[in-house]
Amino acid sequence: MNGNWIDIKTSDDTKFQGYLSVPDCGTGPGLIIGQEIFGVNKTMRQIADYFAEEGYVVLVPDMFWRLKERVELAYNEVDFKTAFGYFGKFNLDLAVEDISLSMDKLKTLDECTGGVGYMGFCLGGKLAYLTASKLEPEVAISFYGVGIPEML
């Protein structure tokens, strides 16, 4: 399974990117995957590729693009500090807009033949809660979403 990066256009014609992975059969329902605070790193891309192998058209948008494009951090002490630095500057409202744009982008792709769901990890898990409450995904799943109780 080989994914590639695609452009996602914003309302002001700015672009950000997301990692797209398509099943071998070429089509399937859509799935947005929300990244951890470590960016669209190897782990997030492997998860996308796994779900593509299961038949989904998967898009992992770069949620840190306004701070730095294509952040890719490892799970070590130095990168943890860097990740929390990005997290501290992160704008949740703009992120939900980016998820909406990502969902719209996925729906326009010929490969996406069904509805679009959202699944997020860590920061992406928090965004799953916001996506479910503000957008209309077919399903929203949060894995170890941070800070959700404080938003209730």
What do these predicted ranges mean?
Residues 1-152:
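N-terminal cap/leader regions of alpha/beta-hydrolase-fold enzymes
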